[in-house]
Amino acid sequence: MSQKFANLDNVVLRADLDKPKKHADRVQKGFTAAYPTQSSIPYRHRTSIIPESEKKGFNSQARRFYSKKDDVPGPGFYNVIHQSPVFSSASLSKRGTCTFPSTCARLGPIISKNPAANAYTIRSDLASKKDFSNSCSSMFQLPSFMKVEKSETPAPNHYNASIASCRQKNNVCARAGFLSKTPRGFIPSSASGGPAPGHYNVNESLVRQSPKFLMSCFKSRTGRGLKPTSIGPGPGYYNPNDQTKILKKSYFPKTTLLNFSAHPLPLPPKPPLPGPGQYEIVNYEGPPKHFISSASFVSNTSRWPMKSSKPNLPGPATYKPEIPGKQSFLYNEDNKWVPAV
């Protein structure tokens, strides 16, 4: 019954859509009901009615199965038989077309010179009496289940360990399987003698005066501010190029001599050699040439041509070479070829 009513509703809806609408292009005035009367605003679009069966799939308004009839065939509807456009050609073959087809087979039959694997005839004396393809009988095999002799060595859980050595000392932590017997709360006896490290005070006054700040227990006794006791000069103290100055005795008396010449004056000492950066180099060849390039690996080749020592030599592209022509020869009476003049 429900299907019949649904069909009747569809027929009524189609009939209403096919009828021409009255007062569709006019604006109605006054009170109008919302349903089932038409809207007062004219419109040209056709109302699409979606059946209730299409609204069940996640609020989708699109039809699940699109059934639109048109003249275009769908995929798989073609029945095309591909035939060659050439029917009466001498070069037509199953493998394609070519200019001069060959009727011979491309690869001939391969005939092996050796016999096949099943073509051998084995002599009866070499053939085995036992067919190894069949399973072996149980008579020539060891029994699968047999009693194994018990070993005299006890199993890991068959020992009777002494309870006294494995007794738990306290209940603070769990007892391990291989527990150490060394007690964790070992306190050395006072009869052992010396104090423990860090429990005694070293008298530093016997070695050197103890400073006022804190020091470590095992302090190094090496002095940090020792003065050198060596008499020899240290590194950088002497000049190897310096000559030893020998005091010369003056042969002139201190008193004034009665002569007309003065005392000879000693030569002035040599000035010290200049160090790096103290030279003042003077360029007497003129101002330096400033190169255009300023790269890190600048070329050392000069950009200005230098005058050659032989000015009479021709430069490049000054030669005019001439291509030599063909030279004719004459055969003389002495059977020799002589160039013609």
From Swiss-Prot:
Domain of life: Eukaryota
Biological processes per GO annotation: positive regulation of apoptotic process; positive regulation of mitochondrial membrane permeability involved in apoptotic process
Predominant location: cytoplasm
Residues recorded as bearing Phosphotyrosine in the entry: 78
Ranges of the STPGR repeats in the UniProt entry: 73-81, 115-123, 154-160, 194-223, 232-255, 273-284, 313-323
GO cellular component, one term: nucleus
Family to which the UniProt record says this protein belongs: Belongs to the STPG1 family.
Role according to the record: May positively contribute to the induction of apoptosis triggered by O(6)-methylguanine.
Protein name: O(6)-methylguanine-induced apoptosis 2
Source species taxonomy: Eukaryota, Metazoa, Chordata, Craniata, Vertebrata
